[in-house]
Amino acid sequence: MLTKRIIPCLDVDHGRVKKGINFVQLKDVGDPVAIAKAYQEQGADELVFLDITATNEARGTLVQTVEAVANQVFMPLTVGGGIQSVADMHALLRAGADKVSLNSAAVADPSLLTAGAEKFGRQAIVAAIDTRWQADQNRYQVTVNGGRTPVDLDAITWAKQAVAAGAGELLVTSMDADGTESGFDLRLYQQLTAAVQVPIIASGGAGSTADFVQLFTQTTVSAGLAASIFHFGELTVPQVKTALKQAKVAVR
């Protein structure tokens, strides 16, 4: 039985972690290496790093940051934000990322997923999808540019296309649930897991251990991702895993 993964997410801005973090034991709450090590000690299964500046001037900083984290941390690292080319992917993978995540650039040009998968293998290519429920169309709509720009594209359709193009995993964020701490959008993940056969990371809405239990007992996603609840110390990774074990969900 495949174990379910718990994945903290770090938003990095010019080499510093943002979104406010108050790990009590950390002197420098903005240092990605210190924060990554703290999550490793907690038993996180993977880490996702999203470069939110993702401009060309910040690109070099991101490579250095990934290198510094990869030297200190032994769990898989997925890095995304502003990846525009196979060369960008190569630089991050060479710096120590295990997987690269493409979002807006892949929507604009799905052949990027294909090129990445051909060069580095599908397992290294993650398609990140930010979506909102569009009630008048009765569908989940794809958004790009950090969820700010809606695209006339059905998220389930795009998930299938991304997998066909070469994505070996999907990281899907419900922009409606994101930051609310009111639970994952179960309907979204039920539809996605019925539509594609690759692992799916669910993101957006985690607020309690019960939310993770619900996610893994009511959908077949592979992983649950969260940022604020872990950063603010509202929940720890061990607390989530303990609750999952009690609910008979297999975790590492």
Swiss-Prot record:
One of its GO terms (molecular function) is lyase activity. Gene3D superfamilies: Aldolase class I. It is an enzyme of class 4 (lyase). Its EC number is 4.3.2.10. InterPro entries: Aldolase_TIM, His_biosynth, HisF, IGPS_HisA/HisF, RibuloseP-bd_barrel. The active site is at residues 11, 130. CDD domains: HisF. It is found in: Cytoplasm. SUPFAM superfamilies: Ribulose-phoshate binding barrel. Its main location: cytoplasm. Keywords: Amino-acid biosynthesis, Cytoplasm, Histidine biosynthesis, Lyase. One of its GO terms (biological process) is L-histidine biosynthetic process. Pathway: Amino-acid biosynthesis; L-histidine biosynthesis; L-histidine from 5-phospho-alpha-D-ribose 1-diphosphate: step 5/9. Pfam families: His_biosynth. It catalyses: 5-[(5-phospho-1-deoxy-D-ribulos-1-ylimino)methylamino]-1-(5-phospho-beta-D-ribosyl)imidazole-4-carboxamide + L-glutamine = D-erythro-1-(imidazol-4-yl)glycerol 3-phosphate + 5-amino-1-(5-phospho-beta-D-ribosyl)imidazole-4-carboxamide + L-glutamate + H(+). GO terms for cellular component: cytoplasm. NCBIfam families: hisF. IGPS catalyzes the conversion of PRFAR and glutamine to IGP, AICAR and glutamate. The HisF subunit catalyzes the cyclization activity that produces IGP and AICAR from PRFAR using the ammonia provided by the HisH subunit. Heterodimer of HisH and HisF. Belongs to the HisA/HisF family. This is Imidazole glycerol phosphate synthase subunit HisF. It comes from Lacticaseibacillus paracasei (strain ATCC 334 / BCRC 17002 / CCUG 31169 / CIP 107868 / KCTC 3260 / NRRL B-441) (Lactobacillus paracasei). The gene is hisF.
